Amino acid sequence: MRNISDLPNDLLVKILSLIPIKVAASTSLLSKRWGSVWKLIPTLDYDGTYSAAALEFFGKFHTLVALRFMKLTIEDVHSTTCFRSVKNLSLLDVKFSSDKTVERLLSCFPILETLVVHRWGADNVKTFAICVPSLQSLNIRYTVGGYHNPKTDHGFVINAPSLKHLDIVDHFSGFCSLVNMPEQLDAEIHLRHIDSEKLLESLTSSKKLSLCLKPQTGSYPGGDFDQLVCLELCVMCSLDWLNLILRRSPKLRSLKLYQSRERNWSCRNSKHVRTKWEQPNSVPECLLVSLETVKWILYKGTQEEKDVVKYLLKNGNFIKTMSIRFSSVVTLEERIHIPMEFEFMGRINSSRCQLSFSKL
């Protein structure tokens, strides 16, 4: 043990990071030299049941920058608990004693920048409130086995004025409220049950959006997406959102439409699928002055999809490239005929539009 004690702190910390935290903490009994070395561990994983005293204990890690709680229960949080150096926090299948416990826990991280929350339905929390002024990246997964009905009284309230990236996949919530959102935010939103109109009102300043939403249930009362440059949109459930966002996005340059098997959580097995395409009453400004790139992933060749592509080719004055990746349901004959039809449309509008086709 004397030879190990002669090693520099940096190397000892790396060694201690590879063993269970309880074992690492027990090394403090070996000698004075080991008394505080374990507190320098930068990343901590822990599972079990947390009392308020246990949380306060982990606040003694002076250089801890990443903390992951997984499959555990947090009973309470002392007001004096503080993780002053932690920038990355993961809450994975964590149960809490109440909604307030969530709020008290997150208030212990004054410089938190990245938060990952994975919920699995039975965590004793109805309103999961995330109020973190320093937060820059938020990743939320709220899923349950199968396709359960939503809990209308379960959901999220997010108040993060410094947020730069938001990624939500939510199969379960009845609501999601975004308050005090920053002017610039990239967001990836996949929602099964939540009415999306109000949520989108908080994202109108985004430059990049990736959306998979249930069909519109009412009129959209929000403003325009004046800063939106890149849009990814799942069209498996509804083409309504494409119409609306094209009309409201005067600076849009890149459009990606998809029905990817990996990314259609929000509308798989949906009872509300609606794929009817209705042309806008007037040509959206982005088609006339800014849209340059169009991609379609898992294109099936339905009449509605053909109508969309033809409309974009006819009215997209500045579209430089359009790439279409066929779904496996498209026959060989269709894969030959469709490019010929669209290439003719492209030549009518502009010789600068380069069309490409491929099989998934």
Curated annotation (Swiss-Prot):
Coiled-coil annotated residue ranges, if any: none
InterPro entries: F-box-like_dom_sf, F-box_AtFBL13-like, F-box_dom, FBD, FBL13/AtMIF1-like, LRR_dom_sf, LRR_FXL15/At3g58940/PEG3-like
Organism superkingdom: Eukaryota
Keyword NAD: no
Ranges for domain F-box: 1-53
Kelch repeats: 140-186, 235-285
Keyword annotations of the record: Kelch repeat, Repeat
Domain FBD per the UniProt entry, residue ranges: 276-326
SUPFAM superfamilies assigned to the protein according to its UniProt record, in alphabetical order: F-box domain, L domain-like
Pfam family, one: F-box
The keyword Signal is assigned to this record: no
Protein name, per record: Putative FBD-associated F-box protein At5g56430
Native source organism of the sequence: Arabidopsis thaliana (Mouse-ear cress)
